[in-house]
Amino acid sequence: IGFTGTPLLSSDNITARTFGGYISVYDFKRAVEDGATVPLYYENRGEKILDLHNPEITDRILDAIENADIDVDQQDKLEAEFAKEIHLMTAEPRLRSIAKDFVGHYSDLWTSGKAMFVCLNKVTCVRMYNFVQEYWKEEIKALKAKIKTATQQEAQELERKLKWMQETEMAVVISQEQNEIQTFKKWDLDIKYHRTKMEKRELDKEFKDSSNPLRVVFVCAMWLTGFDVKCLSCLYLDKPLKAHTLMQ
């Protein structure tokens, strides 16, 4: 018999004080060795993107951001309290740099699997989707030009990649909130297109299907926990996550 629970109170080890220490531990290393899970690799892409300036994320900001999607009022309070940090994290030049790097990185891994991109908030999800779409089209255009000058063998592989990029679909997956149309209009964004897609299609099933062309999703809170996707190979984080929120 095994008992498990999510350690929510990291600063106050109340479970250990109440029930005592662990009887046994089945850690991540053993799970990988047993084949129960796959290895996890972390790469700091931020250090490789030129002119990418990340604001200092303190524990206080981290706690606030982690709970930012509970309700609209709390999110408004967060954005007012940490306006400078959030402004830096969501500035267009920064988001564009990340979007361009994402397109280059993920398109190079086109034979691996699907990708999930975690953004700071809902508006940023849609903005990042738009930026990625722009650079994705540019990459397709560059790929077509490259095929023209490639050898026959190189061209065959590049054409396979081109077909994959042209077939790849992306989606924004965020929860609905009151007055969201007006909220997104302030940023000159149309949420109706994305909301219709979320309501009329079973995006969760499509994303879990390795043969389905829905290969990239942009999220900020949904699908981060309790959502298993065996064909997911890359998780791109541009939102501070920690503890159970990160590992689940």
Report each predicted region and the residues it spans:
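Conserved C-terminal RecA-like helicase domain
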Residues: E79-V216
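Interdomain helical connector at the RecA1-RecA2 junction of SF1/SF2 helicase-like NTPases
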Residues: D12-K114, M128-E134, I140-A150
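Conserved nucleotide-binding/hydrolysis micro-motifs of P-loop NTPases
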Residues: T6-S10, E33, G46-L50, K122-T124, ...
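A short acidic (Asp/Glu
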Residues: D12, V126-F131, D228-C231, L246-M247
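A short beta-strand element within the Helicase C-terminal
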Residues: R215-V219, W223-K242, L246-M247
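Conserved helicase ATPase motor motifs in RecA-like P-loop NTPase domains
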Residues: I1-D12, G35, F117
